[in-house]
């Protein structure tokens, strides 16, 4: 898991392996971020993030599915 500077993880968030949280991203309380997920810089995550997807925006939406291992 990589959490960039300025990212804000609020409360009890479960973050999976091989996950990247971009600079200035906000992940709200009581959410799960799946394995291999990427949260783009400045995104606001308001709901659970599935495994192997990229999310971005405010509120964050899935913008692409990622192939495991890439």
Where are these predicted regions, by residue range?
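Structural signal for interior beta-strand "rungs" in well-ordered beta-sheet cores
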Residues: 1-56, 61-63
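A glycine/serine/threonine-rich, flexible loop-to-helix segment
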Residues: 52, 67-70
